[in-house]
Amino acid sequence: MENEFDVVVVGAGISGIGAGAHFNLKCPDQTYVILEGRESFGGTWDLFKYPGIRSDSDMHTLGYSFKPWVHKKSIANAPAIMEYLEETIDEYELHPHIRYNHHVETANWSPKEGKWIVSVTDKVNNKEIIFKGKLLYMCSGYYKYAHGYEPKFEGSENFEGQIVHPQKWSDDVEYENKEVVVIGSGATAATLVPELAKKTKHTTMLQRSPTYFVSAPDEDNLANNLRRFIPDRLAYFLIRIRNISFQQFFFKRARAYPEQAKERILNMVKEELPEDIVNKHFTPSYNPWDQRICLIPNSDFFESIKAKTSSVVTDHIEKFEEKGIRLKSGNFLPADLIVTATGLILESFGGVKMSVDNKPIEASDTYTSVSYTHLRAHETLD
């Protein structure tokens, strides 16, 4: 049948594209289709449009094992990552396998047929299509694409400016010469603040509590020099092994000796910023890797603080007012634009309703003792 395959892949983001390339490399006799609900490939890197969006892992470890990263910058922005993905699609001839605007609604395992019965909405023609596959490969990410996590802030309806979540950033967001407050201190905020600060009147990062930040160059000089003397693939392999090994070593040592790791990280930040700022705004109450450590390429966030184009406030929100945010300390933050970098909404299987023999299953019931990230079927980029 036309829509029967050996494998049905859900999602044409980084994982889905990687899956297709692996099938072509290792299972060329197997048929497969990649179903993508949006009009483009790329997943996260096509969805998010906020200023400065970039990776916060180096591309020698984030990239595919089978395709070298050859850009000068190893901490890459979204356009460079999209270019890399498009090259992968072209090189591994994935275009015929991808069906865009095909949103997967349900997936039912049929014991009788020994196949997954996948119900899909063709968004262009507004009709249901059934796909069948022996294997269902979920590469749909881990968060809800429709919208991000936005806490309810008292008085938000009274704020006279614009409120935007980074996941919904669009070209009509006006921030030049504005007073901007970014709520949050995770990876998105760390990316946004220094980039916005280049054009705003002032950008303030408002956080409830501090986060660990580590600065690193956005270019890997060793990788760039190696490519001058040895083949790209060999250089990539060597740098990939080096970086993965270093990251594993640092992680394990940080978990084994948390106080030493904490002291080392904070001393690095104190080389960038005054000690009083570090003590108040950059000293978390938890140990390194209890939560994610945020990467700062070329110290851009720290540089913007030193240039006084941005600042950090550690406090709690009392309410939004017409002209800004009232804090529980009583202080007031003026704002023309508020960016709620407050995170994502986790969603297993991309929101697809799963069932076995027409009996619904819940991921939270099935995976009660497995880390959520293990629900992602294809961790190509770790």
Q: How should each PLM-predicted stretch be described?
A:
Residues E272-P334, I338:
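Alpha/beta-hydrolase fold catalytic core
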Residues E150-E160, K328, F332-V370:
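Central helical "cap/lid" subdomain
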Residues F5, V9, I14-I98, Q207-R208, ...:
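Beta1-alpha1 glycine-rich phosphate/pyrophosphate-binding loop at the start
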Residues I75-M138:
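Feature captures the FAD/FMN-dependent oxidoreductase FAD-binding
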Residues H102-V104, K168-W169, H316-I317:
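Conserved SAM/SAH-binding loop
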Residues T373-T380:
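Conserved small/polar residues in nucleotide/adenosyl-binding loops
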Residues I14, A19, Q30, S40, ...:
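Rossmann-like dinucleotide-binding core of oxidoreductases
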Residues K132-G141, D336-G343:
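Short hydrophobic core segments
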